[in-house]
């Protein structure tokens, strides 16, 4: 199963350091710090680069174990979530990768786990190969705040991706509070798009403003009639009161204009949603865009009531760094 065809690749990487995820405990990180496993970028190889500990590696690497036991790292998720799948990535680790790994999880209402914390198995021990992705689906609806990666007995991991859905107790949401319902940290997901040649669609929903052009969604130059689009599932149904389309960092490659369609979708799969999106109602009529600028739309929005999905259309192509949809959740 490769990266592009793994079904849980469309979920949020809950271990992404950009969400605030961090390593809070580690048994050993002699050769390379465990925090590198959580970096959003792809691992790289630096030929001939060494530091005081040895060969520089883009990931977490422990020393060779000369006694019983195994190494482990505890990750506090930036946002609690339900896992849908994992990728234990050993790229560039050859001859120094662990033969096996497993995952445990826990839910801490406050703080970090301690010696009295009860851990549950999330992924039983699986075999690992060097310089490879290792994709494993997770069929477990329990939310976690912390994950513990166990490697047997030692070695290096380039990246740990923990794909899932952010967990939020919407019943405790104060009535009338407006939230960014498209935000990844609130459960928003990019489902499909016409093109993502230069920047992945999921970047639109990342926290904060984009750090550079690569941290947004950007399509290839369109050489045929039509326009580009992306479909986003909101984290929770709600009525949208303001939309923000941010073209930060996009200057000679921003869209000329954009529009937003929306619908309340019940049931169906992603293929059906994509096919029907062309006929969704208009939430935001076509609006002119400017380069490197945050555009906020309020009075231009049509009152559609509660919705679950939106389709952002950009004309004809280009890049958008962030999409924000502020609204009031539809609570029971």
From Swiss-Prot:
Q: Which reaction does it catalyse?
A: allantoate + H2O = (S)-ureidoglycolate + urea
Check the record and name the PANTHER family matching this protein: ALLANTOICASE, INACTIVE ALLANTOICASE-RELATED
Supply the HAMAP family for this chain: Allantoicase
Cross-referenced SUPFAM superfamilies: Galactose-binding domain-like
Q: Which InterPro entries match?
A: Allantoicase, Allantoicase_dom, Galactose-bd-like_sf
Please state what the protein is called. Probable allantoicase
Q: In which pathway does it act?
A: Nitrogen metabolism; (S)-allantoin degradation; (S)-ureidoglycolate from allantoate (aminidohydrolase route): step 1/1
Record's family?
Belongs to the allantoicase family.
Instruction: Name the UniProt key words of this record, in alphabetical order.
Output: Hydrolase, Purine metabolism
Enzyme Commission code(s) on record:
3.5.3.4
- Tell me what organism the protein belongs to: Pseudomonas aeruginosa (strain ATCC 15692 / DSM 22644 / CIP 104116 / JCM 14847 / LMG 12228 / 1C / PRS 101 / PAO1)
Q: Name one Pfam family in it.
A: Allantoicase
What Gene Ontology biological process does one annotation of this record name?
A: purine nucleobase metabolic process
Q: Which Gene3D superfamilies match?
A: Galactose-binding domain-like
């Amino acid at each position: 199963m490769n990266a592009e065809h793994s079904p849980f690749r469309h979920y949020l990487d809950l271990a992404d350091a950009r969400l605030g995820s961090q390593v809070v405990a580690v048994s050993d990180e002699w050769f390379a710090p465990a925090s590198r496993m959580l970096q959003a970028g792809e691992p790289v190889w630096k030929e001939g680069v060494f530091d005081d500990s040895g060969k520089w590696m883009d990931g977490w690497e422990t020393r060779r174990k000369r006694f019983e036991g195994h190494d482990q790292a505890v990750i506090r998720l930036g946002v609690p979530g339900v896992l849908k799948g994992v990728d234990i990535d050993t790229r560039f680790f050859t001859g120094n990768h662990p033969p096996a790994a497993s995952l445990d999880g826990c839910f801490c209402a406050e703080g970090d786990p301690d010696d009295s914390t009860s851990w549950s198995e999330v992924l039983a021990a699986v075999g690992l190969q060097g310089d490879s992705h290792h994709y494993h689906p997770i069929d477990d609806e329990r939310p976690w705040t912390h994950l513990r990666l166990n490697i047997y007995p030692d070695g290096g991991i380039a990246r740990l991706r923990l794909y899932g859905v952010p967990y939020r107790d919407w019943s405790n949401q104060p009535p009338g509070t407006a939230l960014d319902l498209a935000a990844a940290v609130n459960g928003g997901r990019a489902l499909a798009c016409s093109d993502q040649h230069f920047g992945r669609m999921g970047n639109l929903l990342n926290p904060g403003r984009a750090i550079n052009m690569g941290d947004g969604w950007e399509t290839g130059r369109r050489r045929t009639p039509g326009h580009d689009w992306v479909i986003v599932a909101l984290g929770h149904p709600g009525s949208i009161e303001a939309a923000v389309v941010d073209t930060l960092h996009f200057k000679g490659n921003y869209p000329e204009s954009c529009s937003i369609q929306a619908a309340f979708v019940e049931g169906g799969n992603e293929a059906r949603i994509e096919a029907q999106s062309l006929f969704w109602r208009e939430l935001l009529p076509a609006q002119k865009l400017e380069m490197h600028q945050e555009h906020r739309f309020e009075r231009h929005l049509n009152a559609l009531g509660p919705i679950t999905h939106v389709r952002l259309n950009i004309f004809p192509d280009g890049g958008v760094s962030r999409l924000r949809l502020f609204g009031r959740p539809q609570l029971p």
